[in-house]
Amino acid sequence: MKIAIVGAGVIGVTTAYELARDGHEVTVFERNSAIAVESSFANAGVISPGYVAPWAAPGMPLKVFKHLFSRHAPVKIKFPLNNDDLTWMWYWWRACKLDTYIANRSRMQALASYSRDRLHAITADASLEFERSEGYMVLLRSAKDSAMVQPNLQVLRETGVPFKEISASEARLIEPALNPDNDFYGAVHMPSDEVGNCREFTLLLKSESQRLGVKYELNTNVAGVFYDKFAIVNIANKDTSLFFDAVVMCAGVHSAALLKPLLKPLKRKLPLIPVYGYSISAGVREPLNAPRSALMDERYKVAISRLGNRVRVAGSAVIGGKHDNSPENRNTQAISTLYKVLHDWFPGAAHISNMGASVHEWQGARPMLPDGPPVIGPSGVPNIWLNLGHGSSGWALSCGSARVLADMVAHRKPDIDASGFNIERFS
C-alpha cells in the first residue's frame, strides 16, 4: 500500500521502518527541517520496562496536591488551566482507580518489554550504534524512599524482572563516582535495563528506512487529514491534496488538532495534551567523576544518564500554563531541580560552570494521555491509523508500538495483546 506518516519523531520513524519492511511505499511528513527535534530530541534515554507505569495511580492526585507549591516537586501544575487541561485531569482522576491502574500498568509493561526486544532485533539487524550502556539504578535517599518503592518492586518480582536491592556501599561499587559526601540509604539495581541516545537511534533508523524506500518530506506542515475514498493529506500553504491508501498519525501533541475534525462526527475524544519535561546535557568534565550508565533519583523522579561523552539529567513534569514550547515558557524551577540532583549525586561530572557555552537546556512537550497507555490502531475513520500518546515513555515504547501498528495495518495479530490501546476507551 501507499502509506503516509505524519510526524518524524522516534514514533514516526520506527513506524515508517516497520511498514517499509512489510513492503509498503511510505512517505513521512515532518513540519520541521530535521527529524527528532521535538520530544525525541533530548530525553533521558532510559529503557526500563519494569519501571514503565501510568501516572494515573491510586493516591497520585493527593501527592500532586501536597507538592503543589514545592519548589522541587516532580509534577507541577501551572496556571491557568484551559478546557483541554481540565478535561485531561478529569480522565486522569478517573483512571487512578486501583483496578484501572493495574490493568494499564500491565499493558504498558508488556509493550515496553516487547519494545525492548524489537529494539535489540533492529539494532542487531542494522548494526546500529547509538551511545548505549547497560544497567539502571534507582537511588534511594532515605528509608522512606525505600518503603515507597516496595509496591513497584513487588510488581517486578511478579513479572520476573531481574533486580536487586543493594546498600549504598554496593551501589558505589557499581557507580564509583557517586558523591562520597551524600549519605544515602541504598538503591535498586536492574542490570538488564539500559540507556541509549534516542535521537541518534532515530537518525540512524531514518537512513535504514530510506534504504527500504521511505521518503521524508521535511519542512512540510500538514494542515489536515481526511478520508474520501482515499486517505487524503492536505499540505499547509499549498493548494495540494495528496492521496494515499492509508495515513498513520504520529505527530505527538499536534495530532489532537489534526484529528479533531475527523473524530468529532464519530463522538470520539482524544484527551491528548502537552506535559512539559526538561533536561540538561553537558560534556563530561572528568570521566572518573561521571556516571557509567543510568540512574534515577526516586524522590525527585530525575534521571541521570551517561550518553557517550555527555551527561544528561532529565525529569520534571509541568501540566497547564501556556501551551508554548518556546524558551520563554520554560519553567526555571524545574530546570533548577535538575542542577540540584546532578550536584547531589555527581558534583564533578560535567562542565556546567559556564552554562551558556557548555550546557544545553531543553524543554520537550510530551504527548500525554491521561490513563497511561498510548493509542495504537484504527481511528474509526477508514484508513486513518493512530500511533500516538506515548508521553514520557515514547523511547521505551517506540519499537514495539511500531511493530504492533504495522501488524494491524497488515491485518495480522500482533505478538502482544493490543486490545487496551484503542481509542474507544475515551468515548
Regions found by a protein language model. Give the residues of each.
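C-terminal catalytic lobe of FAD-dependent flavoproteins
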Residues: 163, 192, 298-299, 343-427
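Dinucleotide-binding Rossmann-like beta1-alpha1 core, especially the glycine-rich loop
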Residues: 42-168
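Glycine-rich FAD pyrophosphate-binding loop
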Residues: 21-41
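Active-site lid/adjacent beta-loop-alpha segment flanking the redox-cofactor pocket in flavoenzymes
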Residues: 125, 268-271, 275, 283-380
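Central helical "cap/lid" subdomain
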Residues: 32-38, 236-291, 331
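Helical element adjacent to the flavin cofactor pocket in flavoenzyme catalytic cores
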Residues: 147-159, 181-241
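N-terminal Rossmann-like FAD-binding beta1-loop-alpha1 element of flavoenzymes
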Residues: 2-28
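Short beta-strand to alpha-helix junction loop
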Residues: 103-116, 138-148, 188-207, 326-334, ...
